[in-house]
């Protein structure tokens, strides 16, 4: 399946506690999950590691969110949009389905 959402894409969250928030994709995992900057923040309890000089305690981290729960953000329409693929000049390109503009 082609990657409709890629790293550095601006996305909007469709479901969950962060619904409606926008952010940039920082990492895409092969299992269909994405990390979005500032979205799905969790608190982890980490143990100290004296050998590495790492202090323990509560650490806030971004957790992965399923790619089906985010949609690419179209800045022209200011809304979430769907992604299509087509060939232009022998290259496969992504485009917004609402206005046929290349991403």
Swiss-Prot record:
Q: One Gene Ontology cellular component annotation? A: cytosolic large ribosomal subunit
Q: Which organism is it from?
A: Haemophilus influenzae (strain ATCC 51907 / DSM 11121 / KW20 / Rd)
Q: Which Pfam families match?
A: KOW (PF00467), ribosomal_L24 (PF17136)
The gene for this chain is rplX
**Which keywords appear in this protein's UniProt record, sorted alphabetically?**
Ribonucleoprotein, Ribosomal protein, RNA-binding, rRNA-binding
Instruction: Describe its partners and assembly state.
Output: Part of the 50S ribosomal subunit.
Gene3D superfamilies recorded for this chain? 2.30.30.30
Q: Which GO terms describe its molecular function?
A: rRNA binding; structural constituent of ribosome
* Stretch forming the signal peptide: none
Q: Has keyword Electron transport?
A: no
> Does the keyword section mention Flavoprotein?
no
One GO BP annotation of this record:
translation
The UniProt similarity line reads: Belongs to the universal ribosomal protein uL24 family.
Q: What does this protein do?
A: One of two assembly initiator proteins, it binds directly to the 5'-end of the 23S rRNA, where it nucleates assembly of the 50S subunit.
Q: Which protein is depicted?
A: Large ribosomal subunit protein uL24
């Amino acid at each position: 399946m082609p990657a409709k959402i890629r790293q550095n894409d601006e996305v909007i969250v469709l479901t969950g506690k962060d619904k409606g928030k926008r952010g940039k994709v920082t990492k895409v995992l092969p299992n269909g999950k994405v990390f979005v900057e500032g979205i799905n923040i969790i608190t982890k309890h980490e143990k100290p590691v004296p050998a590495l000089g790492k202090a323990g305690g509560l650490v806030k981290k971004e957790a992965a969110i399923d790619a089906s729960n985010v949609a690419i953000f179209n800045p022209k329409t200011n809304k979430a949009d769907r992604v299509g693929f087509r060939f232009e000049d022998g290259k496969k390109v992504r485009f917004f389905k609402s206005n046929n503009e290349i991403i």
